Amino acid sequence: IIDKFPKEYEFIIAIGYKGDSVREYCELAFPTHKFTFVEIDNVDGYASGPGYSALQCKSYLQRPFYIATCDCLIDSPMPHLDGNWLGIHPTSYPEKYSTVQLSGNDIIRYSNKNENGYDMAFIGLAGIWDYGVFWEQLEDNIVEGEIVSAFKTPSNYPTFKAKKLKWLDTGNLDDLNKTKEYLNDKPLSLQKDNSEITYKEGNTFIKFTPNKSVLDNRIIRAKELGGKIPDNFKYTNNFIS
């Protein structure tokens, strides 16, 4: 999803569980991008959730901004930040998703995981133009840490549009496998039975190695090989590149 945005954009990333791995990967894969990582103090306790995490990032987002949840991919161009909008995709299972009712391209009603909801699902991608309204709505209506609490009453925003996008969900194992099949496993991510994963970003290969002793031995070997390996070899606590 990072590749969908201009390189000069700033990315505010909330991190918690496995946050070090997220930070290390982003910095290896996108060394020229500007990232700000916000460590969330409550990732699994009472009232934790995407909305709570977003509020921890509030001070960095006092201007129009995009929201992208970590399990959302799209096979569409990134819409412009030209107003308040939600990315949507048709669904037959309103009980599984936050859904919206439309009048043309205007969002007029919202429902959260209700079998009596609507046929357009919020995909986890949004443009927030009236950020003051967003923060006010989130703080006033947040339930169980949900970020979608900010969209409970669409009429509280000056305008709220829908953007229909080709959504690739990765929020559960079945959808993740479908997405990998759809993308032909691109960008390359070769996962082994030992939980190692190799990623490819541009011309850079990045290997995630959860076994610390294996990783340390590879780093030692790379140093001993010296000039026999590429001179841009890098390593972190979880990766080699």
What feature does the model see in each segment?
Residues 191-221, 230, 238:
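ATP-binding glycine-rich loop module of kinase domains
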